[in-house]
């Protein structure tokens, strides 16, 4: 039985995941991990959210939005060249997890703590 999960996004509107599709089931399982869920608490714009009341987006919302864009691009690519098919899981996973290693205050904390979010993403 296929289960659908819907995320309501301010930019992309409804982002639907279907567990009947193996690649989307993988994404749903990744979203449910503690490492990904912590992105809900990290502001997309870091300290700017303290100055601009409209800068409220999280790395969680951003990452799901990036996945949505990657899925649309993939669907277009596959229409023109079926050789892209074998890269679906890698593309989807990379799009979703690209910011997994971000710390508090986003890129600002990288300079303060000498920490690179790409390296932390790989470690996680």
Locate predicted features:
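Non-catalytic interface/linker regions that flank or bridge core catalytic/transmembrane domains
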Residues: 1-41
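Alpha-helical phosphate/pyrophosphate-handling elements in metalloenzyme active cores
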Residues: 45, 51-90
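Divalent metal-dependent catalytic cores for phosphoryl transfer on phosphate-bearing substrates
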Residues: 86-124
